């Protein structure tokens, strides 16, 4: 009987350890870091669909190579490409030019440092910093230079030996964008949260939410828009391979086409779908 109890405890501890470095979300970042010397390659594919009228499809392709440096520090590099297909598109207020284009969109570098571990401490806490350069406008698909400095405060709390994973991110992203030869500033902010439940040893199901806004010229008293997304997330992991699918419809936004509340379809879309496929070495 004691042997059975020991085996059950060992199994629970092992399952928690194996799940310690999972990222079961498509949009929400976890507080885990890769073990020293471990590599991970992830392909991110995000489809953004639907404006007020017309045909709109934006595709973001991000190839990530990640490396654990120390027990608390990891770094990564991203190579980004984008595809846009726009025809007769109107947003809440903006009219977009027709476009059918695929192109290289620059890259970025990630630095993530873990202050508290979600497995060994009361909760997980990490700081994330990602400077990057873009050569294609994310919404319109036009050529244009921008430099971003994404900074994230990451909180994570695990329950039931890691069977339930919850996480919260506060995102601050200053941006420099070149317009007609001059550099203009913008500040984006987002609050994201997620919960993921382990159904089987390999499958997780959960939900993610994001509230995003932006402040032109970094003036905090003049928000450009608000957009709230909420949707399900499905995660699969077996050995060193994993995949995550998040379906993210916009639930509410401001201003809409009437200038009130509804869906904001200038800086955001009706629906986002993100697929992450990765393998660890």
Predicted features and spans:
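Bacterial N-terminal signal peptides that target proteins for export
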Residues: 1-7
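Bacterial N-terminal signal peptides
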Residues: 7-16
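Transmembrane beta-barrel domains of Gram-negative outer membranes and organellar outer membranes
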Residues: 20-280
